[in-house]
Amino acid sequence: MIVSYIVAMSNTQASSVSTRQRGRPREFDVDLAIDKAIGVFAERGFHATSVGDLSEAMELTQGSLYKAFKDKKDIYIAAVERYKLVQTKRFEAAVQTGKTGREKLLAGMNFYAEACVGRSGGQGCLVVGAAADLASLDDDMARVVRGAIDAREKILARLVREGQADGSVSKAMDADALAKTALCLLYGMRVVGKTGLSKQQLSAIVEIAMKVFD
């Protein structure tokens, strides 16, 4: 189960997340296997995903899985950590196409809007889905999910402050409050994107969302 954003992740030159090395070296690409697991977890969530689902998607026997990971929870944590790592790099690259803070925020909005189209949109975002299930996750899993959410919010806060400094974003509102509002808008797009929004609808949503920075 490999979708468009997972292909992009596999081609990204990112540092490998901790893969909890144990025993003899494994004869498969751990990052590539985790990328495939991300698609399953994003679409089904942690609880509805079985080890059999992961074994099939990752194209590994359950024996190979258990040599690399302790259990399903271990795979999930590795998936969230890798998703955070790679998606943060992609998001940072996208926003840097803007010149002002506002233009960078717009680029960030468009980054999420583009992810809402097609198969990626229908599948949803791993972190957004995990946030909705946060109450049902144990402390270890909840911690890595919150870490991914906090990382995105920190980038948004930085861009808001950059915009306020260069005059492209209003100073009437607190920067942290604006960043959290932007985070809610971005994550909300990913949730509603699962219903099959058109590019035109998403474009209109982004246009209206940007008004919070006026």
Give residue ranges: language-model regions.
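Hydrophobic alpha-helical segments that form the core
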Residues: I6, Q123, V128, K171-V192, ...
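Amphipathic alpha-helical packing segments from all-alpha helical-bundle domains
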Residues: L85-T88, E103-L106, D139-A165, A177
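Hydrophobic alpha-helical connector segments
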Residues: A78, E92-Q123, A175-A182
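Amphipathic C-terminal alpha-helical segment
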Residues: A115-V117, R158, E162, A182-K199, ...
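Recognition helices and adjacent regulatory flanks at domain boundaries
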Residues: R26-E27, I38, A42-R44, G52-D53, ...
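Helix-turn-helix
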Residues: S10, L32, K36, V40-D74, ...
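Amphipathic alpha-helical segments used for helix-helix packing
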Residues: K104, R119-D140
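N-terminal intrinsically disordered/low-complexity leader segments
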Residues: M1-F28, A172-M173
